[in-house]
């Protein structure tokens, strides 16, 4: 099982196939995705890779994290995420994973945080039909109606759908097709929509319900760490 990647959602556009058919795609950008740490079975009880993406200012990074970045000889990162992997898919600390980690035609699962919409009513939040427009209904046309019976059941059940905060939820969209990959610019074009606002962080993984294509690199598309990479300053 390979590692996933951290990317930023740039927005949506469309590309054309050789047959002239247009395909709506979401553009995802990789921002210096590097391996920051390894988790091993002997030391941690499980196997995983901690990846970092984006460049953070040193003054905004906690001292403990600055020391961690310094040991890994990587610049401070804005986003840190762990991906579970098999022992044979571990990648050396400091290595950069490039966009050709995923190949065109491959299916991926993408996880993002939905756009926040604040406090909304049940009609918008849960697609309720609302109450009647007339015949005794006043003011409460868009309410959710009764929440529980009188004597029976005499209570409101847990998880009753009501008005409340809508959005800012972690959502995974499965089986999205990779349309194009641009290694030089670090772009991955995925067919369809992905949850989240422009500039938001998303996680890309190999689709769990699809077979990994033969051309996919294993353990990943790796760019070796540069010897002169500036590390975080301790202190």
Swiss-Prot record:
Subunit relationships: Part of the 50S ribosomal subunit. Forms a cluster with proteins L14 and L19.
One of the protein's GO biological processes: translation
GO cellular component: cytosolic large ribosomal subunit
Source organism of the structure: Rhodospirillum centenum (strain ATCC 51521 / SW)
Name recorded for this polypeptide: Large ribosomal subunit protein uL3
Modified residues (N5-methylglutamine): 151
Post-translational modification note: Methylated by PrmB.
A single GO molecular function term of this UniProt record: rRNA binding
Function: One of the primary rRNA binding proteins, it binds directly near the 3'-end of the 23S rRNA, where it nucleates assembly of the 50S subunit.
InterPro entries: Ribosomal_uL3, Ribosomal_uL3_bac/org-type, Ribosomal_uL3_CS, Transl_B-barrel_sf
């Amino acid at each position: 099982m390979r590692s996933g990647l951290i990317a930023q959602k740039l927005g949506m556009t469309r590309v054309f196939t050789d047959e002239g058919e247009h395909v709506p795609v979401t553009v995802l950008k990789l921002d210096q995705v590097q391996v920051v740490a390894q988790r091993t079975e002997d030391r941690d009880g499980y196997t995983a890779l901690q990846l970092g993406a984006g460049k953070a200012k040193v003054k905004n990074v906690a001292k403990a994290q600055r020391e961690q970045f310094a040991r890994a000889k990587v610049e401070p990162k804005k986003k840190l995420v762990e991906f579970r992997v098999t022992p044979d898919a571990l990648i050396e600390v400091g290595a950069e994973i490039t966009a050709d980690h995923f190949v065109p035609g491959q299916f991926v699962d993408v996880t993002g945080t939905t756009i926040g919409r604040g406090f909304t009513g049940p009609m918008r939040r849960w697609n309720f039909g609302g109450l009647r427009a007339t015949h005794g209904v006043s003011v409460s046309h868009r309410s959710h109606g009764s929440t529980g019976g009188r004597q029976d059941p005499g209570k409101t059940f847990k998880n009753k759908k009501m008005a409340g905060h809508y959005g800012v939820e972690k959502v995974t969209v499965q089986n999205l097709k990779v349309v194009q990959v641009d290694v030089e610019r670090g772009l991955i074009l995925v067919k369809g929509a992905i949850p989240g606002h422009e500039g938001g962080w998303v996680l890309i993984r190999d689709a769990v319900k699809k077979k990994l294509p033969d051309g996919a690199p294993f353990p990943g598309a790796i760019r070796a760490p540069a010897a002169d990479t500036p590390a975080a300053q301790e202190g």
